Swiss-Prot record:
InterPro entries: 4pyrrol_synth_GluRdtase, 4pyrrol_synth_GluRdtase_dimer, 4pyrrol_synth_GluRdtase_N, GluRdtase_CS, GluRdtase_dimer_dom_sf, GluRdtase_N_sf, NAD(P)-bd_dom_sf, Shikm_DH/Glu-tRNA_Rdtase. Pathway: Porphyrin-containing compound metabolism; protoporphyrin-IX biosynthesis; 5-aminolevulinate from L-glutamyl-tRNA(Glu): step 1/2. The record marks H96 as: Important for activity. This is Glutamyl-tRNA reductase.
Length: 425
């Protein structure tokens, strides 16, 4: 049984592959139970974002069986996963989780959202009843390390994120956003960040579209924006110079036909679109239209690279914190290996004690002198407790196993052999 981290991310897999194995928030709980039943795991958690899908597990499962389970569950070609996955076990898995939670493995170095997403993965697994003591301990150490990275380094400073990159790209297309209208589809954390960055750049008009009007209004009110339903997008799409979408929809929300109609009403004035969602919210064919500039999360990488240089030095410090955290984790894991031995020792000693106590009770019931019974009990306990260790130590001495002899002296705080000789002299 060991800790396992299996996944794909923006470095190992294309957007096409990532969206095939992405899990929506409503799918994760049932997937967790299916993984326990079908992949030979005793504990499991799933992290699924626009840039990665990862399984954190504790069990005896092999890489091939885990990949096979994921391929079958998501109904994808197993060869695609075999070519694009990564797998870590034991300490390497813990180290990877620490890097992910700290933002060191993100598309945007140091991006803060990933820690909240990992905490959500932990909470969902715990609620589903598939998170045991092993994964719980790992996650707590991971969260502790990530918190230190945030508080002790500047890795979270400077507004660099997918949301910021999307707005930066919009500024490159439209030099002055004060004359433009932006349609934001979704109402989650990423869209909220997009709205904040656009507002800071003085965007003329913001429209927020969501499946529920209440959620759209909740976000819109923060920025003086207009709120609409997803179903109303076709009526308002022509107003938007900028469209940025990030929802959890499993199907595209904007198709080529709807965008063509909007362009006609705009008299083919160009539209800038960024699809941050995985799976995609905007059909890929929309990018074929002459007056549309469509970008996906993969296209944002160049923009992000330009804005992350200031975090490189902080990342080096973060790596040192992670190494320190990993050492603590490994020490804790080594300590756990002694638990079974200590438990077995106590059980053995308890059994011997009960045997001798029973003999003493019977002697007292037969009228024996209590003082003699106590003396016999103490002598018997000493002999019983030390009989097997003494036999083993004699054999160790005969075999020249000095390490065992030194270990026993350390365990019982006995004087060294030289000290014992000095005392006799």
């Amino acid at each position: 049984m060991t800790l396992i981290a299996l996944g794909i991310n923006h470095n190992t897999a294309s957007l096409d592959v990532r969206e095939k194995v992405a899990f929506s928030s409503t799918q994760i709980e049932s997937a967790l139970r299916a993984a326990i039943a079908g992949a030979g795991l005793s504990e499991v958690a799933i992290l699924s974002t626009c840039n990665r899908t990862e399984l954190y597990a504790y069990g005896s499962s092999q890489a091939n069986s885990l990949i096979q389970w994921l391929a079958e569950y998501k109904q994808v070609n197993v060869a695609e996963l075999e070519q694009s996955h990564y797998l870590y076990t034991a300490s390497e898995a813990a180290s990877h989780m620490m890097k992910v939670a700290s933002g060191l493995d993100s598309l945007v170095l140091g991006e803060p959202q990933i820690l909240g997403q990992m905490k959500s993965a932990y909470a969902v697994a715990r609620e589903a009843g598939v998170l045991g003591g092993h994964l719980h301990d790992v996650f707590q150490r991971v969260f502790s390390v990530a918190k230190r990275v945030r508080s002790e380094t500047a890795i979270g400073e400077n507004p660099v994120s997918v949301a910021y990159a999307a707005v930066s790209l919009a500024q490159q297309i439209f030099s002055d956003l004060k004359q433009d209208t932006a349609l934001l589809i979704g109402a989650g954390e990423t869209i909220e960040l997009v709205a904040r960055h656009l507002a800071e750049q003085g965007i003329k008009k913001l429209i927020v579209a969501n499946r529920t009007l209440g959620n759209a209004r909740s976000l819109a009110e923060q920025f003086g924006a207009e709120a609409i339903l997803l179903a109303d997008i076709p009526e308002h799409l022509h107003r938007a110079d900028i469209v940025i979408s990030s929802t959890a929809s499993q199907l595209p929300l904007l198709g080529k036909g709807a965008v063509e109609q909007a362009l006609k009403r705009r008299r083919h004035k160009p539209m800038f679109m960024v699809d941050i969602a995985v799976p995609r919210d905007i059909e890929a064919q929309v990018g074929d239209l002459a007056d549309v500039y469509l970008y996906t999360v993969d296209d944002l990488k160049e923009v992000i690279d330009e804005n992350m240089r200031s975090r490189q030095q902080a990342a080096k410090i973060a790596e040192e914190i992670i190494v320190e955290g990993l050492l603590h984790y490994e020490r804790e894991q080594r300590a756990l290996t002694s638990v079974d031995t200590i438990k077995a020792l106590r059980q053995t000693m308890d059994a011997l004690r009960e045997q001798e106590l029973e003999k003493s009770r019977k002697a007292l019931e037969a009228g024996a002198d209590p003082a003699q019974v106590l003396e016999q009990l103490a002598r018997s306990l000493t002999n019983k407790f030390l009989h097997t260790p003494s036999t083993q130590l004699k054999q160790a001495g005969a075999d020249g196993e000095q390490d065992m002899l030194r270990t026993v002296r350390t365990l019982f705080s006995l004087p060294s052999a030289n000290e014992s000789k000095s005392e006799k002299e």
